[in-house]
Every structure is written in structure tokens, then in C-alpha cells.
């Protein structure tokens, strides 16, 4: 009798599990919106405040920019009707705008709306230096004609106008937010409108009055998970349709790539736009010593780190600009050479009786950071233990970003993605300095980057590049980076390709030139 009851209980449990499985499959099949998952919360959808890749990803679907970079790498009009028209003296830029475009609130997109958005960004934007360093004034010359007056000629402005941060917002909906951020809403001109928002989930739906190519799906649910394991589990159990690679553990990334090879998933990859690097605080000893910084530039075995940390998925990098933006092979930072490092450290009194100790901070919530820190520390122990030691300190990323400009870290692991695909979008945020005392930066982007390093000649070359075009401009920016390599305030480590994986019944993810998934092209079979 007891055995019979056990069998009945087993059958009951089996039936319940079967029903739950069928319900789960049924829910999966009936899913209308495509669910896209990434790591980290989204606290604000204001383009003037956006500074994370996940925020820019959703904004790219909710808004449009004046221009885009097409597949061939050339500037292409989007909200603009034609390419910018530049005056002979290079100080006036006229931008004709497309007509018959409306915002999600029904108001009309025109030159007044574009001027409102650009001026708002100039006033409160987190990255407002991008415009304020270049622009004198913005004028409305006609209902659909915008004029930008420059402080001096700028060859990079056109590329800058492709930045998602400069997507226009409706003056009607943002009339009370001219001087402050509108964190929980977004009203733009894009192919989707925002249906609901909280920091963990955002739902967007196709905008029926969209002026351009309509989305191929019925909507997107953005889900923001807290860690890599949850993201990895969600795509494996089909809880989500698309997984974005940001903050995915590299071992799990390798597993996902193997699932693609076995035809269990699809994947898409964009041009490498994210650089990983270490910043050295150069305004205080021992790292104020240029020879010490130069020695450190020889101490990192990028090939070893790439293999041990990322299984080769992160490409070793000896530049602070993604190579495709220079359009030529360029590696100004030196290769790994512990003997050269030892010789340089000996000239400064280390190795024989004194060991140089460098505290290295890594972001505790970024999986690759800790592995990089551990690998470098162990490599130093193996090759340079008589001269150098690395001590480790893990701090949550938001705290790191807040304290960078305070000079809280002697050495810190960071990453950077340019706001637009141009060398200047990497060089200026790391190297620009408005007030110098010898090689110590007192005011400027080099302070906010945590290096506090500057160079007068480098600054002159950065400014000169704005007067140049084409090959001459690229060659000038290469000179800038050579000086940065000699300064040694940054140590580039690797280059990261944006990647996404999708379930078999979802189309292969496609990426734009700015490293963002083209969400409107995602389609369920």
C-alpha cells in the first residue's frame, strides 16, 4: 500500500512538472515583445545625462540623431536633410532638416526643437564640453534650417553630431526640464516610444507615426540584471530572447560562443569600440616620476592577460584609440619587456634595496577587472618581484567614477567607449587639459579621468587637429597619441568588440558603427 501511495505521489509530481513545463513553453511561444537583457540598472533616460552603453542602447531606439555613420564609414543624413554646409571661413555650419517628422507627443520636429535640445545639452549635459569647446552659438535660420556658429573651425563636429547624446527631445514635453534632467521619461522622434520605465525594466513599442523605416518587431522589453550569472542563465533557459555582452563573464562568453558553433544560438558582433586601460595618478609620487610610469608600461604581458582573462576574446591593445579609427596599424605603447622595466626602475633606486609598491584599484562588479588585476599581480611576482609589487583593492564602479577626479586612486582599471566613432572621442576625454602646471593638469578632462597628466605640446596638437581634414588630421592625432604614450599616464590593455546572442527563433543581432544593436531589425521567426 505504501509503495502504491509513493507511485501515486510520483505521478502527481510528474504531472505538475509537465503542466509547468507546458505553461512555460506556451508563455515562451506567446511572447509578443522581444526581451533584451543586459547588466546593470538604468537610472536615467535623459540623453543629456546618459553615459553608459546600456542607456545609449535604449536611447538609440527611442530617438534619432542628425547624422549617422553608414556601413561604409561615411557620414549619412538622418534627421538632417543633407550633409552640413560649411562657410569658407569654417565658422558657420548650416544644417537643413527633414520635414514632416513628429515627436512621440505629436509636436513637430523643426529647427527650433533641434536648437532647444542642443542648447539644453550645452547647459546641463554630463559631456557638455563636447559642444561647449567648439560652439559659440546656435541659431534658427528657418523653420527647417539650423545654423551652428563655431568658436574656431572644427573638422570633428560633423562626426560629433552622430552622438546619441545629441538626440533631440520635444520642447513641449521638456519645457520644465531646461535646467534639469528628466530621468524617468523620454520623448523623441525614434522608431519606438517609451511605454513604461523603471530602473530594472523598460518597455518600448513601435511609434506608428515614425518617419523612417518601421521596426520589424512588436516591441522590446529591456531587462536589467545585476550580475553575469543571472544573465547567462536567462539566455540558456530562454527567459530572454537577446543577451547583450556588457559585463558578461568571459568564461560564460566562451560558452555562449560554443553554443553558437553548435547551432544552439545566433550571435552578432560590432566593430571594437571599447578600450580597457589602467590610469596612473601622475601628480603625486611615486607615479609623478615619469621614469617609473615608463617602467610600468613595459611590465604588462597583454597576450598572457588576453588568454588567461578572456580566452583570447579581448584583443591586446597598445593604443588608446581603436585601430580602425586611425585607419592604419599604430601601436605607440611598448611591448612587454621585464628586463627594460627592471633597468628603468634601477635608475630610480628600486630593485636592489627598495621595492616599488603600487596599489591597484579594480571595479569589484566588473568580472574582467578582478581577473586582470590578479593576473598582472601574479605576473609581476613571477618576473619582477625584486623590484615591484602590486597590491589590490576592489571598489564598486559607481564609487570609483565619483572619486576619480578627487585623486583617490594611484592606479585604477577602467574602460572607455567614445561618444562617437572618431579618434578625438577617445583622446580628448582622457588627455584634454585647460590649465597646466608643467605636466600636472589642474583643470580639464585629464582631471576627471584620474590621471592629472597634461602636456603643452599635446594640447596644441589636439587643438590643431580641428583645423585639419582627412589624412592630415589623422596623422596629427597620431602625434597626439605618441606623446600620450611617452607620458605614460595611461596603460592600454585590451580592445572589446560589442557582441549579442539571440535565441534560434530571433534574427541575428546587427550592430551600427557606434557599437549599438539596431533594435528595430530584430525579428521573431
Which residues make up each language-model segment?
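Surface-exposed binding/hinge segments that line
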Residues: 130-174
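Extracellular/periplasmic solute-recognition and catalytic clefts
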Residues: 138, 195-203, 221-284, 307
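Ligand/substrate-recognition segments at binding pockets and active sites
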Residues: 199, 346-418, 498
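Structural transition elements
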Residues: 287, 315-348, 364-372
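Aromatic- and charge-enriched surface segment that lines or borders ligand/interaction sites
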Residues: 82-125, 147, 231-237, 286-288
Amino acid at each position: 500500500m505504501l509503495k502504491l501511495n509513493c507511485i501515486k505521489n510520483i505521478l502527481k509530481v510528474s504531472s505538475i512538472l509537465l503542466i509547468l513545463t507546458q505553461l512555460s513553453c506556451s508563455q515562451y511561444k506567446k511572447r509578443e515583445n522581444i526581451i533584451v537583457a543586459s547588466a546593470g540598472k538604468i537610472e536615467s533616460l535623459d540623453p543629456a545625462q546618459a553615459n553608459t552603453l546600456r542607456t545609449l542602447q535604449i536611447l538609440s531606439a527611442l530617438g534619432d540623431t542628425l547624422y549617422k555613420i553608414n556601413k561604409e564609414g561615411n557620414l549619412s543624413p538622418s534627421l538632417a536633410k543633407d550633409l552640413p554646409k560649411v562657410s569658407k571661413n569654417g565658422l558657420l555650419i548650416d544644417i537643413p532638416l527633414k520635414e514632416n517628422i513628429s515627436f512621440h507627443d505629436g509636436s513637430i520636429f523643426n529647427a527650433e526643437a533641434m536648437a532647444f535640445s542642443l542648447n539644453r545639452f550645452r547647459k546641463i549635459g554630463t559631456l557638455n564640453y563636447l559642444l561647449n569647446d567648439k560652439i559659440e552659438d546656435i541659431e534658427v535660420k528657418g523653420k527647417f534650417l539650423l545654423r551652428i556658429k563655431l568658436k574656431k573651425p572644427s573638422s570633428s563636429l560633423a562626426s560629433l553630431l552622430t552622438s546619441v547624446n545629441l538626440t533631440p527631445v520635444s520642447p513641449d514635453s521638456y519645457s520644465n526640464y531646461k535646467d534639469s534632467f528628466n530621468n524617468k521619461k523620454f520623448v523623441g522622434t525614434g522608431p519606438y516610444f517609451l511605454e513604461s520605465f523603471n530602473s530594472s525594466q523598460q518597455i518600448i513599442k513601435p511609434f506608428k507615426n515614425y518617419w523612417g523605416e518601421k521596426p520589424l518587431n512588436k516591441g522590446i522589453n529591456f531587462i536589467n540584471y545585476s550580475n553575469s550569472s543571472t544573465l547567462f542563465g536567462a539566455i540558456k533557459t530562454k527567459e530572454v530572447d537577446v543577451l547583450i555582452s556588457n559585463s558578461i563573464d568571459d568564461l560564460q562568453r566562451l560558452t555562449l560562443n560554443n553554443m553558437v558553433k553548435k547551432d544552439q544560438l545566433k550571435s552578432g558582433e560590432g566593430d571594437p569600440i571599447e578600450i580597457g586601460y589602467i590610469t596612473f595618478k601622475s601628480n603625486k609620487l611615486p607615479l609623478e616620476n615619469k621614469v617609473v610610469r615608463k617602467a610600468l608600461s613595459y611590465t604588462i604581458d597583454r597576450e598572457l592577460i588576453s588568454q588567461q582573462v578572456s580566452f583570447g576574446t579581448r584583443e591586446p591593445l597598445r593604443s588608446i584609440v581603436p585601430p580602425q579609427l586611425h585607419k592604419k596599424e599604430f601601436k605607440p605603447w611598448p611591448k612587454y619587456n621585464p628586463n627594460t622595466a627592471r633597468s628603468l626602475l634601477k635608475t630610480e633606486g628600486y630593485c636592489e634595496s627598495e621595492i616599488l609598491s603600487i596599489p591597484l584599484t579594480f571595479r569589484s562588479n566588473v568580472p574582467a577587472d578582478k581577473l586582470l588585476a590578479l593576473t598582472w599581480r601574479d605576473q609581476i611576482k613571477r618576473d619582477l618581484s625584486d623590484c615591484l609589487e602590486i597590491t589590490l583593492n576592489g571598489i564598486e564602479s559607481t564609487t570609483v567614477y565619483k572619486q576619480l577626479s578627487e585623486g583617490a586612486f594611484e592606479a585604477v582599471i577602467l574602460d572607455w567607449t567614445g561618444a562617437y566613432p572618431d579618434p578625438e572621442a577617445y583622446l580628448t576625454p582622457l588627455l584634454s587639459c585647460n590649465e597646466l602646471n608643467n605636466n600636472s593638469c589642474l583643470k580639464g578632462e585629464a582631471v576627471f579621468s584620474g590621471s592629472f597628466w597634461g602636456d603643452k605640446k599635446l594640447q596644441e596638437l589636439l587643438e590643431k587637429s580641428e583645423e585639419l581634414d582627412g589624412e592630415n588630421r589623422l596623422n596629427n592625432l597620431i602625434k597626439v597619441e605618441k606623446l600620450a604614450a611617452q607620458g605614460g599616464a595611461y596603460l592600454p590593455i585590451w580592445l572589446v568588440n560589442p557582441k549579442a546572442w539571440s535565441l534560434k527563433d530571433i534574427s541575428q543581432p546587427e550592430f551600427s558603427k557606434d557599437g549599438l544593436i539596431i533594435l528595430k531589425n530584430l525579428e521573431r521567426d
